[in-house]
Amino acid sequence: MNKVGLIVPTLNAGRMWESWLKAFSRQTRKPDYLLVIDSSSSDNTVSLARAYGFDVQVIPKSEFNHGGTRQYGVNQLPNADIIIFLTQDALLASFDAIERLVAVFEDEQIGAAYGRQLPHTSAGPIAAHARLFNYPAESQIRSLEDKARYGIKTV
């Protein structure tokens, strides 16, 4: 079975963080490695993450960048076969979201996968449209042959 790592960059995750952690703890497939990379939060983000079993690496806020911080996390999990990136405000829509995301990698032709992002209930019309347009309800498998049709959205 593939070893799965989860990486969540955080900064002052606030009131929603404990709800996120509670919802995550009910997932049917638990990742083997749980890593929060925190950008020096001044609230209880770090202590809550640790209470829910996450390893926490704290970095200076000035060192955060989206790609580099995530790569730093990947480097911290050398034994993970699959890496899942989540954000501190992305609530998983179902209790089997991780399980379903990981299952696609049973097909050795699959190199990357992502879950559907739904708009928050408070999202404005533009944000809601962007999520619904970019993340349709149907599962899709794409290959490099689809590049002419989908461009950057091929992967």
Model-predicted segments: where are they?
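Hydrophobic targeting segments
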Residues: N2-V8, A23-F24, D32-I37
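Short, well-formed alpha-helical segments that are part of the catalytic scaffolds
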Residues: N12-R26
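Acidic helix N-cap motif at the loop->helix transition within catalytic regions
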Residues: E18, D43-A51
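A conserved acidic beta->alpha catalytic loop
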Residues: D38-V46, L91
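Glycine-rich, basic loop-to-helix element that forms the pyrophosphate-binding segment
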Residues: K61-P78
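Short beta-strand-to-loop acidic/aromatic patch adjacent to the donor-nucleotide binding site
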Residues: A80-L91
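Conserved donor NDP-sugar-binding/catalytic core segment of glycosyltransferases
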Residues: L91, F95-A128
